[in-house]
Amino acid sequence: LKQCKYMEDTARARHDFRHTLHTLKILSAKEDFSSLNQYLDRYLNEFPVNETVFYCKNNSVNALLNYLIPSALEADIHTDLKIILPDSLPVSDIDLCSILGNILENAINGCMTVSAENRNIQLSVITRHDTYLYIVATNTFNGIVRKNNSQYLTTRPNGHGIGLTSIQITVEKYNGTVQFSNDDSRFYADIMIPI
């Protein structure tokens, strides 16, 4: 849902930008440089420049990462991403983005429980030998976990705790495997999906 909103907002911004360009062209043609500078200043204050980053060949994954990674960076979280995807996968874009979105959202929340200098997320999404899709993620956190048997539970006060369950269900839909684990300072997610 957030990804769709991001794409709609981007399309609307591009459409509106045409009007901005026409206004700038008219002010420039009239050589009204004072008004031109004021207009540009207002525009830049209202719409900070966010450069689109292309992490991989998959447009849906790029849209998701361009939505989530700036939030991580604004929170002083160091991110190390390696995303190498083929042109097509048997995993739908919706399911892939659901998995990655839940992983990253949980990782960002986990990082927020430690001091800024210790915040780190590593995410690798690759295929091996054209037989498996591997998603490996790790993030720092405060080491506090809640479990019911081997099932991780949310530690957030108002959290719903369905992110990891959603990942598990989605991966199993493709006959894949998921393993979540942790040590005193890091949380790990290891996913393998046959392709």
Predicted regions and their residues:
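Short beta-to-alpha transition helix within the HATPase_c
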Residues: Q38-N45, K57-A75
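Conserved short strand/loop->alpha-helix "switch" segment adjacent to the catalytic nucleotide/phosphoryl-transfer site
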Residues: V53, K57, T79-L100
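Conserved ATP-binding N-box helix of the HATPase_c
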Residues: D93-E117
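Short beta-strand/loop element within the Bergerat-fold HATPase_c
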Residues: N118-T131
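Glycine-rich/acidic phosphate-handling loop/turn and adjacent ATP-lid/helix
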Residues: D130-G161
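Glycine-rich nucleotide-binding loop
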Residues: G143, D183-D190
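Glycine-rich ATP-binding loops of the HATPase_c
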Residues: N175-S185
